[in-house]
Regions:
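Anion-binding (especially nucleotide phosphate/pyrophosphate-binding) glycine-rich loop
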Residues: 1-125
Length: 127
């Protein structure tokens, strides 16, 4: 887990923004440390993907959590895939098509990450 204080928030609109704490988590083993950190600080928390579809404030007096879960695991031969939340959505679509795993290729070119897909309501794009 990496913790940065007074860190810039990158976003697709290139709005200048920063936050009090920016925390990168690399794997699920760091969740306990993250929980302790959040509990001790008693600040609002926001989970950030790639910074698309957000309009950040000039300064966020809280904790930004940036998951760095960039893994793709093929679990068996019947097209079951486990995907990390930080994977870019369009990259995932291209990767699945390249592996002959079909079904959501019409959802290509949508900005954001896999973890943000439910919040961004990606399914509303026609699938």
């Amino acid at each position: 887990m990496n913790i940065f204080e007074n860190h810039k928030i990158k976003n697709s609109l290139q709005i200048k923004s920063s936050c009090r704490f920016y925390v990168e988590i690399n794997n699920k083993n760091e969740f306990n440390d993250l929980h302790v950190f959040i509990s001790n600080k008693k600040l609002p928390v926001f989970i950030l993907g790639e910074g698309t579809n957000i309009v950040p404030p000039e300064y966020y007096d809280g904790i930004i959590i940036k998951p760095l879960f960039n893994n793709i695991k093929y679990l068996n031969e019947i097209n079951i895939v486990s995907v990390g939340a930080s994977i870019n959505w369009h990259f995932l679509v291209k990767e699945m098509v390249s592996k002959n795993i079909y079904g959501f290729e019409n959802l290509s070119l949508i900005p954001g990450t896999v973890g943000a897909a439910p919040i961004q309501n990606i399914g509303a794009y026609g699938q």
